């Protein structure tokens, strides 16, 4: 069963991220998904995980979207400074689900663990011992663990054994690239101004 989708920016039909401006990539993804393509067409009514940069979190950009539709993903490169932690607390008050992306036990991300609802553990980076240990780490009681980049049946079965409840990766499904029309420059500029 699909519980949610993850929306990722791609500037070409190759399944790789190739944009040097992460703020632009996130904003372009949001405009394409909600305006050019249509979020219902992409998600069939399921929530969508969207990566938000530190700057976009601080600027409150996730608040422009419905909390029942968008799961706010905090990137592993985001520093847990007071402005970001306050922004995440406000988003939670508004009803957003918060996910921590690509967690493999990085100490600098620990302040997020008390806030997030979903901890996404990157199975391509974490050792098998680390994968087993992370769900027992200092995370809030009701946090859900998502095993991402699960590539084999063995990884999937190990994730189930270790208490992961959500799963993502090529073992389960391959990403699909959906193409929208070109984004009108004024639409992207308007979103950025908001």
Segment roles from a protein language model:
Residues 1-71, 76-79, 83:
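Bacterial c-di-GMP phosphodiesterase EAL domain
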Residues 35-36, 58-59, 84-86, 104-107, ...:
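A generic local structural motif
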Residues 84-95, 132-141:
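Surface-exposed amphipathic alpha-helices with a cationic face
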């Amino acid at each position: 069963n699909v519980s949610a989708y993850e929306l990722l920016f791609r500037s070409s039909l190759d399944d790789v991220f190739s944009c040097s401006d992460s703020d632009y990539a996130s904003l372009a993804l949001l405009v394409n998904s909600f305006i050019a393509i249509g979020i219902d067409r992409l998600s069939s009514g399921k929530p969508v995980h969207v990566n938000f940069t530190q700057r976009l979190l601080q600027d409150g950009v996730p608040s422009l979207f419905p909390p029942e539709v968008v799961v706010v993903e905090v990137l592993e490169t985001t520093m847990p400074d007071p402005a970001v932690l306050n922004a995440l607390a406000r988003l939670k008050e508004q009803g957003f689900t918060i996910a921590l992306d690509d967690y493999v036990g990085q100490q600098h991300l620990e302040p997020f663990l008390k806030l997030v609802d979903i901890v996404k553990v990157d199975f391509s980076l974490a050792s098998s011992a680390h994968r087993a240990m992370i769900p027992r780490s200092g995370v809030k009681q009701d946090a859900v663990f998502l095993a991402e980049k699960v590539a084999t049946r063995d990884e999937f079965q190990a994730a189930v054994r270790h208490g992961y409840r959500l799963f993502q990766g090529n073992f389960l499904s391959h990403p699909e690239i959906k193409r929208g029309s070109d984004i009108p420059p004024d639409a992207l500029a308007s979103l950025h101004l908001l």
